[in-house]
């Protein structure tokens, strides 16, 4: 039993080290073209503080952090998966029209601080008034906190 516990601990430590090794800083021009275009189009007025690639066994993702603290996460193809704009707001033209219309009708004037896209679930949205909304793939509200 002790050997099994030791083996589990060793594997855990090795996996943590492997994860740390697979996160590496990169230049924005080393990211997929779709991510570069997205940044140039929607965040042209912001300065990039750091970009990194996170490589895992079956997945690769990219993170960009701007000097004001805003952050974008991209999948391996360069499609955004999470936009976190705690210090500004998510650009309106990146929000799906159905979600944008819902927010305009029900939360007019409230900033959208974060939007996360999950291909299986839909979208999670955090508003400046503390409300969190979850939309399914058909853009219907399925949860609210």
Spans of model-derived segments:
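Bacterial Sec-dependent N-terminal signal peptides
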Residues: 1-23, 39
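Interaction-mediating elements
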Residues: 21-145
């Amino acid at each position: 039993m002790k050997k099994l516990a030791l083996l589990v601990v060793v594997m855990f430590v090795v996996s943590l080290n492997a994860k740390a090794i697979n996160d590496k800083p990169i230049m924005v021009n080393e990211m997929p073209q779709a991510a570069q275009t997205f940044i140039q189009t929607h965040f042209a007025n912001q300065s990039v503080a750091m970009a990194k690639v996170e490589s895992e066994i079956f997945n690769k993702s990219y993170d960009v952090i701007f000097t004001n603290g805003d952050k974008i996460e991209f999948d391996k193809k360069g499609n955004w998966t999470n936009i976190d704009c705690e210090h500004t707001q998510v650009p309106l033209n990146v929000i799906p029209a159905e979600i944008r219309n819902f927010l305009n009708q029900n939360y007019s004037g409230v900033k959208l601080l974060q939007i996360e896209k999950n291909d299986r679930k839909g979208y999670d949205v955090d508003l400046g008034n503390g409300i969190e909304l979850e939309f399914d793939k058909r853009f219907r509200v399925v949860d609210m906190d």
